[in-house]
Swiss-Prot record:
Positions bound to a divalent metal cation: 9, 11, 43
Species in which this protein is naturally found: Caldicellulosiruptor saccharolyticus (strain ATCC 43494 / DSM 8903 / Tp8T 6331)
HAMAP family, sorted: IspF
Name of the gene: ispF
Subunit structure: Homotrimer.
Molecular function terms, GO-annotated: 2-C-methyl-D-erythritol 2,4-cyclodiphosphate synthase activity; metal ion binding
Name used for this protein in its record: 2-C-methyl-D-erythritol 2,4-cyclodiphosphate synthase
Family, similarity comment: Belongs to the IspF family.
InterPro entries: MECDP_synthase, MECDP_synthase_CS, MECDP_synthase_sf
Sites where the protein binds 4-CDP-2-C-methyl-D-erythritol 2-phosphate: 9-11, 35-36, 57-59, 62-66, 140, 143
Amino acid sequence: MFKVGFGFDVHRFSEDRKLILGGVEIPFEKGLLGHSDADVLIHAIIDAILGAMGENDIGRLFPDTDMKYKDISSIVLLKEVSKLLKNKGMSIINIDTTIVAQKPKISPYTDEMKTNIAKALNIEKTQVNIKGKTTEGLGFEGREEGVSAYAIVLLHE
């Protein structure tokens, strides 16, 4: 059986944080505000995987009220979700994602992001796709207030 999951996440920019996307620290004057490292791409992927498995969302699995997740790398959380996936006897066919940000440009970092995600999930890099988009100056991303990410995953059970 095949199962599809969809994920979305958004975080606002913050002056005193690093910008982490797909487990890659991207040089930029602002980072994203959040309880963990606020990696919107990984969070969207986690929610997509959890959705396809019929599990709770990222906020219930890794609540921001639990201090053990404070500033944690989202790659660590993704590895935990990978274990759940394996325990359920499911495997990833492919992941397709979109990062929406006016700035910074994402394309120079997507290859390293794919590598990080594939390694965390124990899949091939060719099973992960990442696209960067702007909103042509529209919306909160266009006003450079934050970043959003969308992910869809196809699982096989």
